């Protein structure tokens, strides 16, 4: 189990590392290609758009061919598209490469996490998802560092190194044993589960909402910090601190959700996210804004582990393949991340940063009010030591 956790953790680490590497480079691409906030939002949105398009195909691949082939497709595509992104010399090639990286991400995450959860005892599911997600956040932590390095060395060499890591991980995954699907579950099972299972519906929404929050933050915060005088290294440092706190917290949060249920940490995440989203538009000092951004990352990131665990709990209860469960998570995350980046950037460009942030505050408060009336239908799992 530990070896599999390390492998899956490494896969999602590399994936999120490259996803987050764009953040400190956004001001560079804005200057080089003349992108405004809307154009920067579109570039950020290409990755989750690719994940959205590949969400269902990745689940079908895991259900039909198995988790290992799904992971290998994702890692192979990541290696190719990372090199392409590093060498891109126009807006359309950047956008296309970023879109295909999102496709690769859907396959890597769906296959990797389904592989892990299928092998996990039910009482340790939250902890293992939290540990894997902690590794993913550590990748997001290191990603801005890669982006900052790329701003000095050039994107080709920096992103070429990331592609090399993907190739190494593909070789390791190929050498690791994985069970083949015992039966082929039709796509109709996913549709039926999403339509009929209230817990899956709730978990999907609680995956989409933080994606909206992070998508908006990923565009507006770096550009605002740049306006206040900070360069790529400073922006990267802010996200480094934020992701470090998230990475340390995710496994603890997973264990807490195993012990006490999925809803208490989700309610806390909603309340804290509403507060920081309310505060984000106002700081006029870079250091103060940096502190609020760190708090925002911690609050927004507190959704992922309990929300994903809620979806996998419901999948097990309804007999849904885990590959389909994580396909649903991808389908929920992708439009949120893309919508937050593209719509948040466009709305802020047309009005001000306050409008998208305050709209998200209202969404968090409305969801919290609804969740206060929601009751879990299953008792908390007994956490295994």
Question: Where do the model's predicted regions map?
Answer:
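Juxtamembrane intracellular "pre-TM" segments in multi-pass secondary transporters
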Residues: 1, 177-205
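Residue-level signature of mid-helix packing/kink "hotspots" within the transmembrane helices
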Residues: 48-56, 140-141, 243-251, 337-338
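Conserved MFS/SLC helix-loop-helix module at the cytosolic interface between two early adjacent transmembrane helices
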Residues: 53-89, 257-263
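Paired small-residue
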Residues: 81, 92-100, 287-295
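Cytoplasmic helix-loop-helix junction between adjacent transmembrane helices
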Residues: 97-136
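Intracellular juxtamembrane helix-capping segments at the cytosolic ends
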Residues: 108-120, 303-317
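Helix-loop-helix hairpin linking two adjacent transmembrane segments in secondary transporters
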Residues: 131-174
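C-terminal membrane-cytosol helix-exit motif in multi-pass small-molecule transporters
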Residues: 164-182, 370-375
């Amino acid at each position: 189990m530990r070896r599999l956790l390390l492998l899956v953790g490494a896969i999602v680490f590399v994936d999120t590392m490259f996803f987050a590497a764009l953040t400190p480079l956004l001001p560079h691409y804005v200057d080089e290609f003349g992108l405004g906030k809307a154009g920067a939002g579109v570039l950020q949105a290409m990755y989750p758009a690719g994940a959205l398009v590949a969400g269902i195909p990745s689940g079908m691949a895991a259900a039909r061919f198995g988790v290992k082939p799904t992971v290998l497709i994702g890692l192979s595509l990541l290696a190719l598209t990372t090199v392409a992104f590093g060498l891109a010399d126009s807006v359309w090639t950047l956008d296309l490469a970023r879109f295909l990286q999102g496709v690769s991400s859907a396959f890597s995450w769906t296959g990797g996490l389904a592989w892990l959860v299928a092998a996990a005892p039910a009482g340790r599911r939250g902890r293992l998802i939290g540990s894997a997600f902690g590794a993913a956040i550590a990748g997001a932590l290191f990603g801005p560092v890669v982006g900052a390095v790329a701003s000095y060395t050039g994107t080709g060499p920096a992103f070429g190194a990331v592609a090399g890591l993907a190739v190494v991980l593909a070789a390791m995954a190929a050498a690791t044993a994985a069970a083949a699907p015992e039966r082929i579950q039709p796509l109709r099972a996913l549709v039926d589960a999403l339509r009929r299972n209230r817990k899956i519906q709730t978990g999907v929404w609680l995956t989409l909402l933080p994606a909206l929050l992070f998508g908006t933050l990923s565009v507006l915060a770096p550009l605002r910090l740049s306006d206040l005088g900070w360069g790529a290294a400073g922006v990267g440092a802010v996200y480094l601190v934020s992701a470090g706190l998230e990475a340390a917290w995710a496994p603890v949060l997973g264990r807490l959700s195993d012990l006490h249920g999925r809803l208490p940490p989700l309610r806390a995440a909603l309340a804290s996210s509403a507060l920081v989203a309310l505060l984000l538009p106002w700081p006029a000092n870079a250091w103060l804004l940096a502190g609020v951004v760190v708090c925002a990352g911690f609050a927004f990131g507190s959704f992922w582990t309990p929300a994903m665990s809620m979806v996998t709990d419901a999948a097990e209860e309804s007999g849904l393949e885990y590959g389909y469960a994580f396909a649903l998570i991808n389908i929920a995350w992708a439009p949120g991340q893309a919508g937050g980046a593209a719509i948040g950037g466009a709305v802020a460009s047309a009005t001000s940063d306050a409008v998208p942030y305050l709209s998200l505050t209202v969404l968090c408060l409305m969801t919290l009010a609804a969740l206060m009336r929601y009751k879990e239908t299953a008792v908390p799992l007994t956490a295994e030591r």
